[in-house]
Amino acid sequence: MIRDLSKMYPQTRHPAPHQPAQPFKFTISESCDRIKEEFQFLQAQYHSLKLECEKLASEKTEMQRHYVMYYEMSYGLNIEMHKQAEIVKRLNAICAQVIPFLSQEHQQQVVQAVERAKQVTMAELNAIIGQQLQAQHLSHGHGLPVPLTPHPSGLQPPAIPPIGSSAGLLALSSALGGQSHLPIKDEKKHHDNDHQRDRDSIKSSSVSPSASFRGSEKHRNSTDYSSESKKQKTEEKEIAARYDSDGEKSDDNLVVDVSNEDPSSPRGSPAHSPRENGLDKTRLLKKDAPISPASVASSSSTPSSKSKELSLNEKSTTPVSKSNTPTPRTDAPTPGSNSTPGLRPVPGKPPGVDPLASSLRTPMAVPCPYPTPFGIVPHAGMNGELTSPGAAYAGLHNISPQMSAAAAAAAAAAAYGRSPVVGFDPHHHMRVPAIPPNLTGIPGGKPAYSFHVSADGQMQPVPFPPDALIGPGIPRHARQINTLNHGEVVCAVTISNPTRHVYTGGKGCVKVWDISHPGNKSPVSQLDCLNRDNYIRSCRLLPDGRTLIVGGEASTLSIWDLAAPTPRIKAELTSSAPACYALAISPDSKVCFSCCSDGNIAVWDLHNQTLVRQFQGHTDGASCIDISNDGTKLWTGGLDNTVRSWDLREGRQLQQHDFTSQIFSLGYCPTGEWLAVGMENSNVEVLHVTKPDKYQLHLHESCVLSLKFAHCGKWFVSTGKDNLLNAWRTPYGASIFQSKESSSVLSCDISVDDKYIVTGSGDKKATVYEVIY
């Protein structure tokens, strides 16, 4: 068969031509050739992709180089602005000290010259920047505080703006050291020399690493670049740390200001140098409008049967208080509407202003040789750290209220990668501290906020010592670490010893919080006290931490046994007064003192649970109380405008201090000698207990609702209806730090180790701060 087939199809037959329908002929050599061709194609494609990747890596490196350049430029400019801010503050302080020694005629001339120096127009600024650009062009970039990119602007990669777009900033930065607007030539020359030395140190620290970095970058891959970038950022952080040690805490120096009326427009808070006793210039033109009188209503679920409306001239049966103070004005509804307790109003009294002082107290338009519309502001810390007085220059510079606060905050966030939490108060011209009419301001600078009052009533601004804000036991700032959502207005707070639990008193109950675990958002227990609709006004722990005493809008005090498996009321003390505003415990834990709404001070024997004595003297409600460390002397403040001291051994009144305003809070310094008093007129007064001298402090904008000394006695805090928490140096009142909350701060307490502060506020929460030393 095979032979037949071979005959039919002989091998010598020529093959037919290939037809498209026939299958492709495969051979080993052809397959190898095809594989080789495909391999060469893939190899070429791989080579093309590799070139593309290398090009992208090169562009990435270029982008990173520009990022570092812009970061250096921003950082250097920020440092320069801080330095100039400090120079201006010192020069202002010198003016304030020198001008009063001049004759009245010369004072007017100098004041006018200073005011003219502050008025810098945009046209002048543009001319200055143009001159700097020309000088920069002629000098080929020498002398700039930060390096320029090594590439011409025309050859930059896409999406990179030409360097000319930032040349104005660079020129401005290089110009900062050479200009001053204050006519004191010798001082100016001295500060300029110091400033030049500082600039040289900055350039050697930040510019040189950048130059070496760029020179070697050509032969590095992106991994090497990343490690170098991290190293450089570490060096920049070290530079920042050195400036922080000099008192310019730019990262911590702004306060988060959340206004109830306009939450989108917070304002920079005042901060103060140890060398400068001054107020924020943004609060100097007009007093808050007087508040019309309104009734003070008792907390009640049945207003028709229990509400007691009192006019301003009647005795107050339930002034709003906290752990040791009442809340005095009518910003909030009565407790019956599930909000802040009723408040006692007093019309505002605008202080007198003399022409010389008023001309100097207007906000400085441009207090430094650079314009404010760049929108560069210092930034608060990631964890809500509070300000210390080194360099909060938003308040110092008085950036125009027309400037977009959001844009300014976004600029800070973009430069430093932090949340934009800082803005400006659009109504800053409405703010005025309660400065006495005879001392409305100090010529040449920010008005003083701390005054020494001599025995004959003479007031003088206080020159702060060099160690006012430094040294052992003096905080640098504080940061918010926890928020305790109580659910009702928190009128009373106290901290346990050791620091583990916080007790917050609201409407009808005290809630216990474990702050040793910051993640805990719920109270560990709730102690129902008084009636459900009556506010707790004060709660005090005995030193052993096993017993809590609670008082408020009721005639009874509740004594809680906290050592029981479940906290329980072990006794109740009943008085004849309808309300208790504040409590104090003797150091030996044997006696409790309660401030009654009828003005009496009740003395309770805690062991026998009986009333043993009443101190009578206040003609209106007793609002606040404190006891000396040795337990021999008691201090009380009242709505009758008096502060009284009592001898506990003899049971009699020792002293009486009369004021022109109601007393809402007080604290006795643990180390003795000084008594701090917070008043309705927004003042804090620090009295010497044996001498007639005292200090008067003016940073609060409304009534001072609570006050507490640190246990070391070196500082104290006060809170107010202006939403502020202020920390002061004992006794002269240098401002250590300031926090602004979102509502009236009704109460406060400090832990025994002075490491934590707790505040209670009208927005139904308590806030825990960690004190940073």
Curated annotation (Swiss-Prot):
UniProt source species: Mus musculus
Gene Ontology MF terms in the entry: chromatin binding; DNA-binding transcription factor binding; transcription corepressor activity
Main location: nucleus
Keywords recorded for this protein, A-Z: Acetylation, Nucleus, Phosphoprotein, Repeat, Repressor, Transcription, Transcription regulation, Ubl conjugation, WD repeat, Wnt signaling pathway
Underlying gene: Tle4
Function according to Swiss-Prot or TrEMBL: Transcriptional corepressor that binds to a number of transcription factors. Inhibits the transcriptional activation mediated by PAX5, and by CTNNB1 and TCF family members in Wnt signaling. The effects of full-length TLE family members may be modulated by association with dominant-negative AES. Essential for the transcriptional repressor activity of SIX3 during retina and lens development and for SIX3 transcriptional auto-repression. Involved in transcriptional repression of GNRHR and enhances MSX1-mediated transcriptional repression of CGA/alpha-GSU.
InterPro entries: Groucho/TLE_N, Groucho_enhance, WD40/YVTN_repeat-like_dom_sf, WD40_repeat_CS, WD40_repeat_dom_sf, WD40_rpt
Protein's recorded name: Transducin-like enhancer protein 4
Localization terms from the record: Nucleus
